[in-house]
Amino acid sequence: MDRQPKVYSDPDNGFFFLDVPMPDDGQGGQQTATTAAGGAFGVGGGHSVPYVRIMNGVSGIQIGNHNAMSIASCWSPSYTDRRRRSYPKTATNAAADRVAAAVSAANAAVNAAAAAAAAGGGGGANLLAAAVTCANQRGCCGGNGGHSLPPTRMPKTNATAAAAPAVAGASNAKSDNNHANATSGAGSAAATPAATTPAATAVENRRPSPSPSTASTAPCDEGSSPRHHRPSHVSVGTQATPSTPIPIPAPRCSTGQQQQQPQAKKLKPAKADPLLYAATMPPPASVTTAAAAAVAPESESSPAASAPPAAAAMATGGDDEDQSSFSFVSDDVLGEFEDLRIAGLPVRDEMRPPTPTMTVIPVSRPFRAGRDSGRDALFDDAVESVRCYCHGILGNSRFCALVNEKCSEPAKERMARIRRYAADVTRCGPLALYTAIVSSANRLIQTDPSCDLDLAECYVETASKRNAVPLSAFYRDCDRLRDAVAAFFKTYGMVVDAMAQRITERVGPALGRGLYSTVVMMDRCGNSFQGREETPISVFARVAAALAVECEVDGGVSYKILSSKPVDAAQAFDAFLSALCSFAIIPSPRVLAYAGFGGSNPIFDAVSYRAQFYSAESTINGTLHDICDMVTNGLSVSVSAADLGGDIVASLHILGQQCKALRPYARFKTVLRIYFDIWSVDALKIFSFILDVGREYEGLMAFAVNTPRIFWDRYLDSSGDKMWLMFARREAAALCGLDLKSFRNVYEKMERDGRSAITVSPWWAVCQLDACVARGNTAVVFPHNVKSMIPENIGRPAVCGPGVSVVSGGFVGCTPIHELCINLENCVLEGAAVESSVDVVLGLGCRFSFKALESLVRDAVVLGNLLIDMTVRTNAYGAGKLLTLYRDLHIGVVGFHAVMNRLGQKFADMESYDLNQRIAEFIYYTAVRASVDLCMAGADPFPKFPKSLYAAGRFYPDLFDDDERGPRRMTKEFLEKLREDVVKHGIRNASFITGCSADEAANLAGTTPGFWPRRDNVFLEQTPLMMTPTKDQMLDECVRSVKIEPHRLHEEDLSCLGENRPVELPVLNSRLRQISKESATVAVRRGRSAPFYDDSDDEDEVACSETGWTVSTDAVIKMCVDRQPFVDHAQSLPVAIGFGGSSVELARHLRRGNALGLSVGVYKCSMPPSVNYR
């Protein structure tokens, strides 16, 4: 039988499908297809149909009966799918045996054709060569740092034939018969002589444009995208002739299934993909005759030779088990390749069959509870894949790496085009809207800062089917949620929908925040499941429901402490949702991403890790493995250099390369912080590492160095006779964890005894320290200034908060850190002054309400304890056991500088100093009062309470002298009552307030970081989105690292050097939206120099343009010292060295910080690139 193959492809989804009808006996002509990715598959006959779906360079192969199976469930699985996904069985044992027999017969025919080709010098079986690559070279199919598989785990080209059976077997629910069939098919391809494959020829690509009626009325399954969805099609069977393409019969199905299928629609055949090269070369007549003669003796004796010929075509859609060919396509559109070429010449068919029809077959999309790293992470339910809107390929993001769109149209026309895309996104799809927003956001915001909100609302429209169902229905049928949370949405569905609609109508779908905040909410905190994306209001509704359910678990204790005094879960949900949507309380991104879901996903952001064993072998094999596991799962880790073991530089390189490899796949912003001691010889190696190769891991690794007070005393010694000794690692361990007096005595004794050490000048050590700090990734800690409510003899927890590593002590294992921030900007109330003891009026018609601040702090204490209970229940990494010992809270503050601007004050005004100290004192005592009230309502104190200083009625400010503490602003009656209640009832938490910068929470809420000055009026911040590098960037990378002559490189060489990079979006000073457009634009364009131009008569405009580059560092340090008695965790002190400064100023700041009793001298240093820091 002379039949022609048909090739169908979907360029967006990156796969092609080949249908070769064969006779029932499986002895017909053989076809072999090879892919450029290295995959090969053989084609059998009978009821088998082969196909290949290209994903990340991996060929998925399947041969078998496809009556009840779609390509979507059989294609090459993603990285984690190979290990975890299970597919339904699709063929009975009898059908599998029949397919195996057909494949065996096909293999025999291939061997005979190969022998004939060897005897006849070519010819033999027809060959179809198809070279397939993805249009997106980087970003979707495993190119240089794409969104799917890491390149190191992709199969090699020369081993794909061996890897194909494993892939095929994995996609059939561990079926041995199917695995054997796939193995036989791969063997057929391997047996084909490679010399007979002709050269590939390019084919033009022209995608069909569906008619308006078809595009608007095409049925869509639950998980498909409106833009990329096109129904599957199956063509009506007709007689196949050499001049007519072979028809594709419809899949066999039952009568009931046929009744459920909608009316078939016509599909216009698509042109070929330009990246698919196909060529066939028919054998010459002489070769064909010779080949037939060579196999004639075997053909005469074979049963196939005497058997009658099979029917040319069979009726479609029937139940006949003897169909001659069968194909099954997924719900994605499959265009037809009609421009095949033979020997480089196009094939033209004069007579073409009718346009093939379409049959819609619903296929459920895979869903995931959260987009994590896209790799084999520890938690299986954290890495489920989603289909990108670009190509329909499974990955860890909604869009592949962005190819920057270059456009020279004016900003006004560009914004109008974005609005048109947003209004028509249902019909046209979100890809064009996403590309236009991300490519032009920086330019548009700098031109007109007021368009930041418009871009944010347009970006929300990129979510798939966000308004298809009510919000409660979105969650109540989701099996990824905890049963209690899903039951909450079923019980209070109408209440949830009404509250969400009320908030959305009042502040908009982006909740009144800018573009960066919206992108982080949707692509870092939002999840994809059941074919839909979470929007900001959906994320907060899920988190609020999880917190409301958790309140029911503790027996209603939390109801008594919340400021709104709820009586049931619905009212608690309303209180939490209002606080979250107004960004009054800002949880960490991990809480927003995973709260409410089942499984063991960690909802804490960072851990302080100490190895359980200290031998060299267990440390190298265990510690590094554990750290890499936690970093891979998106956790920031703080670890001591002494615990790494082995060569410290080699360990740092290993960890740095791991962080660097994860950057293109990371969902959360993670930092690996290494803390070390300046009295250890490891300090010399780490200093050299930071100064030499530290920039390679910028933003990925950070460092913190412990500097004792004796070190600074020797640095300030005017005689210059005092030297500094750096001891060996084993000797230096004896100095860890000692107080000031003990450390000085032991150090001087080791110095007199002549212990093995390296002697350096203190001045040289400080110069090295300044150079490392100036890099911006090194913090300086004063361990002897750290105070704690826990005596040292019972173990000390992490006291430096989420931003800074552990200073000393701590417990073996993982100590989790929850970061929870309150927004002071929500406490500024508009209106006339109110004469009250809880309000402070500072002008411009606004007042800062301490009553509102009290409500925020009490709600934050309750919310923090609920998060601790969630962590204890899941106990990820065993962190719950350590967390129960002290139940440390890490309540941070954001928006202080924004409050000063709204009140018409500058950062360094005298009123600002007073308000700074009063806010810090009020927050601490209010948090202690709320924690005590929890115990009075029925909760238990933390287990170590009897051995803490709280049991004696002491608080953290009591550890400071009166001169250090300053005047008390809380009443004496309040403090006496609080001490009495603590001694009698206990306290729920051991620590409360942290002085972290909270940059991510501040950017999410659109306010200023911590108690610190604003970074800038407009600055770029990394997002979870990825962008392919431009040609100039790749060329720069080539010249800088590879040292190759640029003029000798081609573009394909450059594409192998660049890697995908995070997209940076602008973060705008929200106060600029409140002033005139002209003044805001001028402030943005002037950049860091804007505050120096005080030419405006409007005080509000002058205050809004103030940034950290113009605020005096002395004012920042003074405020930090004033807050120190009320911040029981360390404060992450930033230092900005402006133009004209030098690193010499750093030493002065460090000396002052040590003398003033700060626990952290410098957390992060910001310096312009022109400053000389060495």
Curated annotation (Swiss-Prot):
<feature type="region of interest" description="Disordered">
    <location>
        <begin position="291"/>
        <end position="325"/>
    </location>
</feature>
<comment type="similarity">
    <text>Belongs to the ribonucleoside diphosphate reductase large chain family.</text>
</comment>
<dbReference type="GO" id="GO:0009263">
    <property type="term" value="P:deoxyribonucleotide biosynthetic process"/>
</dbReference>
<dbReference type="GO" id="GO:0044423">
    <property type="term" value="C:virion component"/>
</dbReference>
<keyword id="KW-0945">Host-virus interaction</keyword>
<dbReference type="Pfam" id="PF00317">
    <property type="entry name" value="Ribonuc_red_lgN"/>
</dbReference>
<comment type="subunit">
    <text>Self-assembles into homo-oligomeric amyloid fibrils. Interacts with host RIPK1 (via RIP homotypic interaction motif); this interaction inhibits RIPK1 ubiquitination thereby preventing effective activation of host NF-kappa-B. Interacts with host RIPK3 (via RIP homotypic interaction motif); this interaction disrupts RIPK3-RIPK1 interactions characteristic of TNF-alpha induced necroptosis, thereby suppressing this death pathway.</text>
</comment>
<feature type="compositionally biased region" description="Low complexity">
    <location>
        <begin position="233"/>
        <end position="243"/>
    </location>
</feature>
<feature type="short sequence motif" description="RIP homotypic interaction motif (RHIM)">
    <location>
        <begin position="50"/>
        <end position="72"/>
    </location>
</feature>
<feature type="site" description="Cleavage">
    <location>
        <begin position="277"/>
        <end position="278"/>
    </location>
</feature>
<dbReference type="GO" id="GO:0085034">
    <property type="term" value="P:symbiont-mediated suppression of host NF-kappaB cascade"/>
</dbReference>
<feature type="compositionally biased region" description="Low complexity">
    <location>
        <begin position="291"/>
        <end position="316"/>
    </location>
</feature>
<keyword id="KW-0426">Late protein</keyword>
<keyword id="KW-0946">Virion</keyword>
<dbReference type="InterPro" id="IPR039718">
    <property type="entry name" value="Rrm1"/>
</dbReference>
<dbReference type="InterPro" id="IPR025735">
    <property type="entry name" value="RHIM"/>
</dbReference>
<dbReference type="InterPro" id="IPR034716">
    <property type="entry name" value="HSV_RIR1_betahv"/>
</dbReference>
<protein>
    <recommendedName>
        <fullName>Ribonucleoside-diphosphate reductase large subunit-like protein</fullName>
    </recommendedName>
</protein>
<dbReference type="Pfam" id="PF02867">
    <property type="entry name" value="Ribonuc_red_lgC"/>
</dbReference>
<dbReference type="Pfam" id="PF12721">
    <property type="entry name" value="RHIM"/>
</dbReference>
<dbReference type="GO" id="GO:0004748">
    <property type="term" value="F:ribonucleoside-diphosphate reductase activity, thioredoxin disulfide as acceptor"/>
</dbReference>
<comment type="function">
    <text>Provides optimal viral replication conditions by promoting host cell survival and avoiding the host inflammatory response linked to NF-kappa-B activation. Blocks RIPK1 ubiquitination, thereby preventing NF-kappa-B activation and virally induced inflammatory response. Prevents host necroptosis by targeting RIPK3 thereby preventing the formation of necroptotic RIPK1-RIPK3 complexes. Also inhibits ZBP1-induced necroptosis. Does not have ribonucleotide reductase activity. Betaherpesviruses probably use another strategy to expand the dNTP pool in a quiescent host cell.</text>
</comment>
<keyword id="KW-1100">Inhibition of host NF-kappa-B by virus</keyword>
<dbReference type="InterPro" id="IPR013509">
    <property type="entry name" value="RNR_lsu_N"/>
</dbReference>
<dbReference type="GO" id="GO:0005524">
    <property type="term" value="F:ATP binding"/>
</dbReference>
<feature type="compositionally biased region" description="Low complexity">
    <location>
        <begin position="182"/>
        <end position="202"/>
    </location>
</feature>
<dbReference type="GO" id="GO:0030430">
    <property type="term" value="C:host cell cytoplasm"/>
</dbReference>
<dbReference type="InterPro" id="IPR000788">
    <property type="entry name" value="RNR_lg_C"/>
</dbReference>
<feature type="region of interest" description="Disordered">
    <location>
        <begin position="170"/>
        <end position="269"/>
    </location>
</feature>
<keyword id="KW-1035">Host cytoplasm</keyword>
